[in-house]
Amino acid sequence: VYLFAPYDTQGRTCRYNPLSYISKDKAFQISDIDSISAAIFSTKVGSDEFWSDQAKDMFRGLCLFVLEQPELPHTLGEMFRQASGKGKPLKDHLQQTVEAKQKEGKPFSSACIDCLNRVITMPDNTFGSVVATFNSKMKMFQNVLVDMATSDNDFDLRDVRKKKLTIYFGITPNKLA
């Protein structure tokens, strides 16, 4: 029996990291990432989907950006931290990291570069709005408790139908928004 309660002020929660379920096979990575981004950046019928779709592209790029750097934690919290620009403007941070990895002989995948380029080549006003949309949905990972609760796995969701496994979600209504 597991209780996933990422906002528990005592830290009494099991951990669940959605990024750990992304396939290592490049052929399936984007669809796995898209499944996660669809849950985070859901759009209401009839709403302007443009900003949400662009934020999903940013999510795709940053997810690959994090996953392709073994020295970084492969977590949603790390994606949010990378989106801050790490003390630099975000465009500069991403471009400088891409260039540095290229020089080290450890270039990012073309899928990662393509996703990032679609976002960082936008005009500044558009880019700023996309980053704001991304941050508005990802800011929950700035919370130390949520970041910790999504940093690793204490159970494997793939075992749900194979083993006797019960997972409770302990999230109060005011945190569901």
Which positions does each model-derived feature cover?
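P-loop NTPase motor domains
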Residues: V1-A177
